[in-house]
Design a protein with these regions (language model features):
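A general secondary-structure junction signal
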Residues: 93-97
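Short alpha-helical DNA-recognition segment
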Residues: 46-63
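N-terminal flexible/basic segments that precede or flank functional cores
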Residues: 1-35, 99-111
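DNA major-groove recognition helix of helix-turn-helix/homeodomain DNA-binding modules
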Residues: 76-92
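DNA major-groove recognition helix of helix-turn-helix
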Residues: 66
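Short basic helix-loop element that most often maps to the first helix and adjoining turn
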Residues: 33-50
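Short, solvent-exposed alpha-helical "recognition" segments
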Residues: 69-74
Length: 111
């Protein structure tokens, strides 16, 4: 029996860039922020209804957020939601790392 050879493309580590999205960096940022928001919601054991009241948005929008359907949420709005869950958000701008071709945007969580 002959063996089949399977070719696999090596990704960049950024699924949005690999899929060719023009706004890959923004999508990655929104996903990182949503991940942190969902962690905070889970840590506080909040229901979607309770989160909707805190954020002042309809509960179905919270369902979208919990399921990472983020088209209706800007990164600024997600940052605002994080502050509504009693967290400070600090933005730090520093020189890019020498091993990167361009600057990066990332979300870091402090203890």
């Amino acid at each position: 029996m002959a063996r089949k050879t399977e070719l696999v493309d090596v990704g960049t580590g950024d699924v949005f860039k690999d899929l060719g999205f023009a706004d890959a960096d923004e999508r990655k940022l929104r996903t990182q922020l949503a991940m942190r928001l969902n962690d905070l919601i889970k840590e506080r054991k909040l229901t979607q209804t309770a989160v909707a009241v805190i954020f002042g948005i309809p509960q179905p929008h919270i369902s979208e957020l919990r399921n990472y359907k983020l088209s209706r949420f800007s990164s600024e709005r997600l940052l605002h939601f994080i502050t509504q869950l009693d967290r400070d958000v600090e933005i730090v701008i520093r020189p890019k790392a020498s091993n990167h071709a361009a600057g990066l945007v990332s979300v870091l969580v402090a203890a």
